[in-house]
Amino acid sequence: MEISQISDIIFKLYLYADATKMIHYTTDGNHAHKMCDKIRNTIVDFADELAEQTFGYYGKPSYTQLTKLNKLEINETDDLGELCARASEIVDILRTEFNKIDKLSGVVSLIDDYKGAMQKNMFLCSFDKVSNYKQK
């Protein structure tokens, strides 16, 4: 897998994290505010650890190898549960590719832990009508 493909996904995760702040600023509910912050922290912490571990294996990228931020797009949504689902699904391709490389088993475990945390967040979003999203 190319560094540029990996960096695309990592930086899209940061965009999803920022999108949670957009939801945070537009909601009145205390539960929704707390969930937005929790989800944002989950995504940011994961993206950082994913980058550190992945680039530890592939080698430190040059600045020019990284994705140009103005070229990135995500499917925006104002539904926090749906945002969790999208931010979780985006790493599926990494898991599939990294699962083929024995030395990246730690990254596969990291991805699995993240996906589990996001599933929990989606469930917690169902309380107090923070999200109407129904998982597939």
Residue ranges and their predicted role:
Residues L15-K38, E97-S105:
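Helix-loop segments that flank and shape redox-cofactor active sites
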Residues M1-I6, S109, K134-K136:
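Charge-dense, intrinsically disordered terminal/linker segments
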Residues I6, A17-H24, A47, A51-T54, ...:
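A structural signal for well-ordered alpha-helices, especially hydrophobic packing surfaces
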Residues H31-T64:
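Conserved alpha-helical segments that form or flank metal/cofactor-binding pockets of metalloenzymes
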Residues L69-M122:
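Acidic/histidine-rich alpha-helical segments that form the ligand environment
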Residues S7-I10, Y14, D37, V44, ...:
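Short amphipathic alpha-helical segments with heptad-repeat character
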Residues M1-I10, Y16, E76-L83, A87:
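Disorder-to-helix initiation segments
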Residues G56-K60, L124-K136:
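Long amphipathic alpha-helical segments
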